[in-house]
């Protein structure tokens, strides 16, 4: 359960992923590679033979010229067998390898490690007996427990290798091992000046003799004095260090003060910059206010022009009084004065008309504001329906401010009713008294106004 289709198919003989088919493919690849190697070896052998023939021709050999050299040369396979016989038997690491059977691919290769059944294999070599399979500290070694001198005496019989320490060190270096220097020690030489004996001068020193002559108590006193002197020296050193620290701190403070002064100068510079900025802003504000004043007080400029015109008149009058003889000139000047006076009168009339219109408009706006305030007060106190109707009309008139004040007056006169007249009288009375009347008086007035309005309606 749960296995894939490939796992099912790889168990079939015809499937390429089966083990038998993979093995067949691998065997075929190995055969092809083996054939290629053989062909390469034969090709190299042929090339070597050709080179030897060419060399012999150059040397002037007559056999080669006649073409009979092949009769005096051995076949290609005979050379390998001769080489094996000359080399002799290969040295095996272990004794069991001499008779052990090996496969073809592992026969010539000694680096392959064998793992025979039931035999312990250790790829280690002993330093003393130079045999594979154990170490010099193992009991298997025949030279176990023997020192270097005893081992050398045993091996001097010719049964084994020499065990001299110098030879052992050399063999270890050749085999890739090395001993530590603490084991080897220093390579001492007799002529080395460091190995020479130096005559001791301690006996001749007067200080040593003096110390030897002192008793134990005197020695203790000396030690105490020396301790005191050392303590004094330490105190002096501490004081010097403290003074140096204080000097460093004072220098640091001075540096801080200088830096703070520089920073204050910078801040003063920045404050001066801010002052200049504020001055610029004030100047801009003044210019703006001047422009507004020019727009607002254009009437003042007109009054100034009138003053200038008066000065001109006075000058002309003086000229007239001075020149009595020239009548024609006097007439012309009089005409000019009349023209100036007429122009000034027209200007004054226009300015006064504008002022009157403005004052009327302002008065009307003030009246509207007062009416709105009184209406709000009436609503709070519970006013009559007639007053509410009049307030609606007044609101409608407020919503259309584009109309001129004359038209508004005409419309108000048309839409005026007796109830509104009484309401306006009440407003005037309240404005005159300064809104000091109480609620009781207000009710009485409203009753009177209502009665008056009824009488007027009856008369109509």
From Swiss-Prot:
The lineage of its organism: Eukaryota, Metazoa, Chordata, Craniata, Vertebrata. One of its GO terms (biological process) is mRNA processing. GO terms for cellular component: centrosome; nuclear speck; nucleus; protein-containing complex. GO terms for molecular function: histone deacetylase binding; protein kinase binding; protein-containing complex binding; transcription corepressor activity. The keyword Transferase does not apply. Residues 305-318, 325-338, 345-382, 406-434 have a biased composition (Basic and acidic residues). Residues 258-273 have a biased composition (Low complexity). It comes from Gallus gallus. It holds the Pfam family Cir_N. This is Corepressor interacting with RBPJ 1. May modulate splice site selection during alternative splicing of pre-mRNAs. Regulates transcription and acts as a corepressor. Recruits repressors to the histone deacetylase complex (HDAC). Residues 231-257, 445-460 have a biased composition (Basic residues). A motif (Nuclear localization signal) lies at residues 231-247, 288-296.
């Amino acid at each position: 359960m749960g296995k894939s289709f490939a796992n099912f198919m790889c168990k079939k003989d015809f499937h390429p992923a089966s083990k038998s088919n993979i093995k067949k493919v691998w065997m075929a690849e190995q055969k092809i590679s083996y054939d290629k190697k053989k062909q390469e070896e034969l090709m190299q052998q042929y090339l070597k033979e050709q080179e030897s023939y060419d060399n012999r021709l150059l040397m002037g050999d007559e056999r080669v010229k006649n073409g009979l050299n092949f009769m005096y040369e051995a076949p290609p396979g005979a050379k390998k067998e001769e080489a094996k016989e000359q080399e002799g038997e290969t040295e095996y690491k272990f004794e069991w390898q001499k008779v052990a059977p090996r496969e073809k691919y592992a026969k010539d290769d000694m680096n392959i490690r064998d793992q025979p059944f039931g035999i312990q294999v250790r790829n280690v070599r002993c330093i003393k007996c130079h045999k594979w399979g154990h170490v010099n500290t193992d009991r298997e070694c025949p030279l176990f427990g023997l020192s270097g001198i005893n081992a050398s005496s045993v091996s001097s019989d010719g049964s084994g290798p020499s065990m001299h320490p110098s030879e052992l060190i050399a063999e270890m270096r050749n085999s890739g091992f090395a001993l530590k220097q603490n084991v080897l020690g220093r390579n001492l030489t007799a002529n080395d000046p460091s190995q020479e004996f130096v005559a001791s001068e301690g006996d001749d020193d007067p200080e040593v003799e003096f110390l030897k002559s002192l008793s134990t108590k005197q020695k203790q006193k000396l030690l105490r004095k020396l301790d005191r002197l050392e303590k004094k020296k330490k105190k002096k050193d501490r004081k010097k260090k403290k003074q140096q620290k204080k000097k460093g701190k004072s220098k640091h403070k001075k540096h801080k003060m200088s830096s703070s002064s520089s920073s204050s100068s910078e801040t003063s510079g920045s404050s001066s910059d801010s002052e200049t900025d504020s001055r610029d802003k004030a100047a801009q504000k003044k210019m703006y206010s001047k422009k507004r004043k020019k727009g607002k007080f254009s009437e003042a400029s007109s009054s100034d022009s009138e003053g200038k015109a008066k000065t001109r008149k006075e000058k002309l009058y003086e000229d007239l009084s001075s020149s009595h003889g020239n009548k024609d000139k006097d007439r012309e000047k009089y005409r000019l004065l009349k023209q100036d006076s007429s122009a000034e009168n027209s200007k004054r009339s226009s300015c006064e008309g504008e002022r009157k219109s403005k004052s009327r408009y302002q008065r009307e706006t003030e009246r509207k504001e007062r009416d709105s305030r009184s209406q709000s007060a009436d609503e709070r106190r519970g006013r009559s329906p007639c007053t509410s109707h009049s307030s609606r009309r007044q609101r409608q008139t407020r919503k259309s401010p584009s109309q001129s004040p004359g038209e508004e007056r005409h419309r108000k006169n048309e839409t005026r009713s007796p109830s509104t007249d009484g309401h306006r009288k009440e407003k005037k009375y309240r404005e005159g008294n300064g809104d000091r009347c109480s609620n009781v008086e207000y009710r009485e007035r409203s009753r009177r106004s209502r009665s008056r309005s009824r009488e007027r309606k009856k008369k109509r």
